[in-house]
């Protein structure tokens, strides 16, 4: 398996959080690209084109209120063909409310805010390691 730069896409509704998470991931040696979730949902930014252009291995997605519509958008996004084989790290402001909606098993990784940015870096690193093992088994 050739070593290539590890790319992470960050999807969030808060511009400040987008910048903070990007800075933390870049300091950890990752290449990070960002998109505002509202731009994706409203079609101002084409999600498929964004993913095809940047080819992220891991996607950090924040499920913000209203949880039901944002969770539904995440599920639709994850099921699209362009997302196959990509790992997701899911963040939220209210873990209990989200778990009541989806149950505890549907999420790759669920982190709560205010979160330690290192938790996101660690979750992305774990997602890459899981992905590498899966690709090695199928190769």
Task: Describe the role of every protein-language-model region.
Residues 115-124:
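C-terminal output helix
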Residues 52-54, 78-84, 105:
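Conserved phosphotransfer cores of two-component systems
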Residues 15-39:
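Two-component/phosphorelay signaling modules centered on CheY-like receiver
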Residues 11-12:
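Conserved acidic carboxylate
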Residues 42-47, 57-79, 95:
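Conserved phosphotransfer microenvironments
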Residues 69-72, 93-110, 122:
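Alpha4 helix (beta4-alpha4-beta5 surface) of REC/receiver domains from two-component response regulators
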Residues 125-139:
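The C-terminal output helix
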Residues 89-91:
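Hydrophobic/aromatic residues positioned on beta-strands within the core alpha/beta folds
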């Amino acid at each position: 398996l050739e070593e290539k730069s590890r790319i992470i896409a960050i999807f969030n509704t808060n511009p400040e959080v987008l910048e903070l998470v990007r800075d933390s991931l870049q300091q950890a040696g990752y290449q990070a690209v960002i998109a505002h979730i509202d731009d994706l949902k409203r079609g101002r930014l084409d999600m498929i084109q964004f993913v095809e252009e940047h080819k992220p291995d891991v996607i950090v997605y924040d499920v913000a209120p209203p949880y039901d519509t944002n969770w539904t958008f995440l599920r639709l996004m994850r099921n699209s063909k362009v997302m196959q084989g990509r790992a997701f790290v899911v963040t939220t402001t209210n873990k209990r409310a989200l778990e009541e909606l989806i149950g505890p098993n549907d999420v790759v990784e669920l982190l709560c805010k205010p979160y330690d940015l290192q938790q996101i870096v660690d979750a992305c690193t774990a997602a890459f390691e899981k992905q590498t093992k899966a690709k090695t088994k199928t190769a």
